Amino acid sequence: IEGYSHWNTCPSGGDNKSTAEDFDFVETLIDRIDDTYNLNSERIYAAGYSNGGMMAYGLAHYKSDLIAAIGSVSGAMLDCYGSIAHPMPVVLLHGTQDDVLPYDGNTELASVQTTLDYWINFNNTSTSPSVTTDNSGPLSVQHSVYSGGVNGVSVEHYRYQEGGHVWFDATYQGQNASELVWNFVSRYDINGLR
């Protein structure tokens, strides 16, 4: 992301590509929008694609007092962890053939399974998911649900077999990535399952 628009997904320093304080920017943005539109502060969500997915993970760690649930599409969680204020519902959508942020990780990035394990442990969900598969579209999509977490929180994963580094148009039971993320996060508020 050197030279491109990006989010700094960890606190200042480390691997950040600029000195922008993006966590503070998001908090200020939420405050300004709330001043105009009177937001429901218990139902603010973070979701993003690629580096935006990384930012969602960062917001979960460093601004969890503002964020009720997160979604990451083709994103990776970096190894900078903050103090999370409440159980955090998380949905991950990732393709097995992602050549930018590899599904199985690499020497610099955690694998999808490592990320799932982190959130499963943090939220104290079941470690044995319920799994369903939809083979009706151009990509086979496997949906794993780790339920029963603190405050009704779950961790969910959509695994797009042969999927690349994209915001997925391929559907799971008729829902595209945008719908899957929204239908997941909107079940929660800052206190857990609504």
Predicted segment positions?
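Sec-exported extracytoplasmic/periplasmic mature domains
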Residues: 31-38, 60-68, 117-124, 186-190
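Alpha/beta-hydrolase-fold serine-hydrolase catalytic core, especially in secreted/extracellular enzymes
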Residues: 88, 117-194
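Serine-hydrolase catalytic machinery in alpha/beta-hydrolase-like enzymes
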Residues: 1-45, 55-58, 62, 169-171
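Conserved alpha/beta-hydrolase "acid-adjacent" motif
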Residues: 99-111
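Acidic catalytic loop of the alpha/beta-hydrolase fold
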Residues: 98-101, 165-167
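Short beta-strand/loop motif that positions the catalytic acidic residue
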Residues: 92-94, 98
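Stable alpha-helical elements in mature extracytoplasmic
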Residues: 22-29, 51-59, 63-66, 111-116, ...
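Primarily recognizes the serine-hydrolase "nucleophile elbow" in alpha/beta-hydrolase
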Residues: 34-88, 99
